Amino acid sequence: MQNNEEPYNTGQYPSGPHGKKSPRLHKCARCRNHGYATPLKGHKRFCIWRDCQCQKCSLITERQRVIAAQVALQRQQAQEEELGIYHPIPLPIAAVIKREHGGSSSQLMLESSSTQTTSTPTSAEWIKEEEVAKPAAGLFAPPPSSEEMGMTLAAVGAADAATQTDQPGHLFNMMSAMIQQLMDMSWELQQGWI
């Protein structure tokens, strides 16, 4: 153990003078995965687990990549807004689910409410009811491999430039959803469910 590392403390007991909690300092996430609380400042190049490829460290690496891409997108949008280039596109407010019983299996119709009005139901998508129930059933499924995670990020990166400039809000929402999935997976790993 290096001199600036200490065994992981849950923070149940206040530290500092007069029992007051000291301000929260950033700790190395990789060290935290392996049971140590190491201050982050000046530590990145010397981290023992810098090249660790365990499941938790791989998840942290993916989360860091996604968050970095999200921050870059936010900065780009702010810069475009300052220059007067950015034109926000209204996103769907809510999805309305309609159930239709017909044929052998029941189906759900997802409609997104938006400001555009069309006479044809092109914005509606038909899916089977079993497909809607899959995320709840897959809650305890094994986590995706790093190759699958890479393919997910590659799919986001493969969006053509026209889509990114025409609909920056759409890409931002996709990245936010990916971050939420990574955070959920991280939480499940910490709980020992995976």
Curated annotation (Swiss-Prot):
Tissue: Expressed exclusively in the primordial gonads of ZW tadpoles. Specifically expressed in the somatic cells surrounding primordial germ cells in a ZW gonad at stage 50 during sex determination (at protein level).
Comp. bias (Polar residues): 1-13
Parts forming coiled coils: none
Intracellular or extracellular location(s): Nucleus
InterPro entries listed in its UniProt record: DM_DNA-bd (IPR001275), DM_DNA-bd_sf (IPR036407), DMRT (IPR026607), DMRT1-like (IPR022114)
SUPFAM superfamilies: Cysteine-rich DNA binding domain, (DM domain) (SSF82927)
GO CC entries: nucleus
GO MF annotation list: cis-regulatory region sequence-specific DNA binding; DNA-binding transcription factor activity, RNA polymerase II-specific; metal ion binding; RNA polymerase II cis-regulatory region sequence-specific DNA binding
Superkingdom of this protein's organism: Eukaryota
Family recorded in the similarity comment: Belongs to the DMRT family.
The name this protein goes by in its record: Doublesex- and mab-3-related transcription factor DM-W
The organism of origin for this protein: Xenopus laevis
